[in-house]
Amino acid sequence: MRRWTLDEEGFTDDRVRYVMDSERLTDGEVPWLDDEPEARFRATYDVHAADTLTMSLTVVNTGDVPMSYEAALHSYLHVGDVSDAGLVGLRGATYLDATETGFPPRLQEPEAVTFGERPVDRVYYSDSSVQLRDAVLGRVVYIVKSGSPQTVVWNPGKEGDHMRCARPGEWRGFVAVEAAACRDRGVTLAPGESHTLSQTLSVETLDV
């Protein structure tokens, strides 16, 4: 029995990927990809880009016993300056605060989730759509999701200056907003069952 050391990105994060073939498809369809020849599931990731951007992950249990998994669609959204951006639509939702020991639950009381030099790393219990309002770029990014009981919100704050995967100051230019099904809201599939996690992004001008 093999064992993986799991990090916050899940067991697929450090798996080896192989380009087996490439083909330009009219509708942008991506063929399904199994984890391994002996896999007990099939995962298909579809991306449709036009006036809106839709991403969906469909997992099918191809095995003979129930399977459980967690998933999140990792959307890193560009902002002009994170200090002048706010995420609206989560007011009244409970969230787990991953910046504190034990992930204590908190209540989102302000209308907007705001960002600055302190890190924000939260799992919101909400299936609602949200809006990322960006005063610097003068736009609103609408995030509409389905099959997702949670929304993950992350920005490393000033700690991002010391991350290996980013240059100093880059943390000011993005917010991660992720449709998720994780922790106690993960997905359990009976044999033959499937689940689709999806989100659609659209952009409009911000009305001041």
Residue ranges of predicted features:
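Asparagine-centered strand-capping/turn motif at beta-strand->loop junctions
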Residues: 57-63, 155, 203
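Active-site/ligand-binding surface loops and adjacent short beta/alpha elements
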Residues: 66-68, 72-150
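Acidic/His-leaning functional-site neighborhoods
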Residues: 2, 114-189
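Short coil/turn motifs at secondary-structure junctions
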Residues: 23-25, 62-64, 80, 204-206
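A short beta-loop-beta micro-motif enriched in histidine and acidic residues
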Residues: 40-41, 70-73, 170
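Short, well-ordered beta-strand segments enriched in hydrophobic/aromatic residues
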Residues: 45-47, 53-61
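Short Pro-Gly-centered flexible turn/kink motifs
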Residues: 57, 188-205
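Extended, loop-rich substrate-binding clefts of extracytoplasmic carbohydrate-active enzymes
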Residues: 1-50
